[in-house]
Amino acid sequence: MDSAAITDHGVMYGVIDFYRAARAEGINPILGCEVYVAPGSRFDREAGSGEDRYYHLVLLAENNQGYANLMKIVSKGFTEGFYYKPRVDLAVLKEYHEGIIALSACLAGEVARYLQRGMYEDAKAAALRYQDIFGKGNFFLELQDHGIPAQRLVNQELLRMHEETGIDLVATNDVHYTRAEDADPHDILLCLQTNKKLADEDRMRYEGGQYYVKSPEEMAELFPYALEALENTCLLYTSPSPR
């Protein structure tokens, strides 16, 4: 692996340590954040509830300007948009979009949320809005597969959306721990974080044990129908990054 990205949820606390550790190992560090996007204004404390209180969006700094803008975006989330999570809105993304590459994110992304509800046209409209903000070639539809049926449904619709809109695809893994054998310790840490017990049925969990750093061979096995998406991911992570 010659490149790696950090995209913690809503924060950038770890980027400096990550950057230094990656450079020390000869790895190209991609600095990013998986931000929370409010469904309306970041100042609105009423819009949306539950899973619609915010959507996920992955942002990657392409260069030094992008890194500076990413810090602005994350700071705005805390100082102006905090409501359960540090949220930003489309106005913030428009103001600080330069030098940033965006990915549609996981099942909690706006595009994927609509697709899971059968609202294809709304999903496509959301994707086109993000492309308009970040520019053609700077917004990607993100394929993921952790053995979850909903992801396979979303992936098929993203392939269709790619054909209809020309928005390029990438294929990623939603990494929350390093190795496959770290799944159980990670589950325990989730319980500690959320004040739950392992036996609680309704607690937050990452099903299937697939949220680790996968090899190129494992990713190719998951996405034989989307080799171009895998190639785009490789190209994405060999692009210039902040120094």
Language model features with spans:
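Phosphodiester-processing cores and adjacent nucleic acid-binding clamps
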Residues: 1-239
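Positively charged, low-complexity/disordered segments
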Residues: 241-243
